[in-house]
């Protein structure tokens, strides 16, 4: 269509601009046509750009009107409670090393004498923790996580030795006698586990050691299986034509593919958790998947911001599922 318009305008340019110029007659109509041609050209560029989709996560968030979590520099977002905890534990956060920038910490209290939720793990735990922190009216919450770093009591494990900064902070938190609930979650599926360990047995041993220690604690422990991970960016699901926004109908993760991606991981969790019944296992699969597919959008709003991080809407759905397992939640 744009090509046809351009050909037609080219004829008009020849007929009413070039011929007018040669005849040295009025240039008013010629100027109008020139402006129209430039406008149409720019319009064509805009249409073509829309057909190519969205260019960034920021575009993705703005076009679909949802909040986008920012991980760029958590250090800039420390609140007064977090800073007070650092001072209390005599931890220096001001050196701003890369390790510390990747430490995701949030709190709505610095008083360890209060009844506490602790949420620990990697960036997945951090985003879930923000939702718990905002909604739990009974207990205060402290979120302590490190990007790409699972929770562990034992740094001698062969599985993912993690940053000393976050482990030092967590060891001090875990000494509090007023912990009432501990939530643990992290990125995990068959591919990521194998990529990190080269051997599933290493992860299985890590999980067994972790559950063994947690089963002896005097607070409730919730281990949350990771949400489905996508095989594509959700940004690719959006089609735009000027102001018309559509989600591709084929934009979902096939359930059988998801089950295949997590078969070994879930089998290990099931096997080990059977030995430690005190630990509550929460599988959020039913929240996002039916027997055919796992959804990525709900009423035109994305549940995922990228391949493995949920949007605030997605986290809210996950949190509502977790609440069902907590008897005393207010």
Question: For the regions a protein language model found, what residue spans apply to each?
Answer:
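Extracellular/periplasmic envelope-modification machinery, especially enzymes
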Residues: 1-11, 15-330
């Amino acid at each position: 269509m744009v090509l046809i318009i351009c050909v037609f305008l080219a004829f008009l340019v020849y007929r009413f601009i070039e011929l007018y110029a040669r005849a040295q007659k009025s240039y008013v109509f010629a100027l109008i046509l020139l402006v129209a041609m430039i406008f149409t050209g720019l319009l064509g560029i805009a249409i073509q750009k829309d057909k190519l989709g969205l260019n960034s996560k920021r575009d993705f968030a703005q076009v679909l009107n949802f909040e986008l979590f920012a991980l760029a520099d958590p250090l800039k977002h420390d609140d007064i409670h977090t800073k007070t905890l650092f001072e209390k534990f005599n931890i220096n956060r001001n050196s701003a090393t890369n390790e510390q920038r990747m430490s995701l910490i949030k709190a709505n209290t610095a008083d360890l004498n209060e009844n506490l939720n602790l949420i620990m793990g990697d960036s997945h735990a951090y985003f879930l923790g923000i939702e718990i922190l905002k909604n739990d009216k009974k207990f205060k919450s402290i979120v302590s996580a490190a990007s790409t770093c699972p929770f562990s009591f034992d740094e001698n494990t062969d599985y993912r030795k993690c940053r000393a900064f976050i482990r030092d902070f967590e060891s001090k938190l875990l000494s509090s006698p007023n912990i009432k609930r501990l939530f643990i979650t992290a990125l995990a599926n068959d591919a990521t586990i194998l990529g990190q360990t080269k051997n599933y047995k290493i992860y299985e041993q890590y999980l067994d050691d972790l559950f063994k220690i947690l089963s002896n604690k005097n607070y409730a422990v919730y281990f949350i299986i990771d949400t489905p991970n996508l095989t594509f960016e959700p940004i690719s699901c959006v089609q735009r034509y000027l102001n018309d926004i559509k989600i591709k109908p084929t934009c979902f993760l096939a359930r059988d593919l998801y089950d295949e991606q997590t078969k070994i991981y879930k089998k290990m969790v099931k096997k080990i958790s059977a030995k430690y019944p005190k630990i509550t296992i929460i599988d959020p699969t039913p929240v996002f998947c039916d027997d055919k597919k796992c959804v990525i959008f709900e009423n035109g709003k994305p549940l995922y911001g990228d391949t493995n991080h949920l949007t605030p809407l997605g986290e809210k759905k996950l949190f509502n599922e977790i609440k069902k397992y907590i008897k005393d939640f207010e």
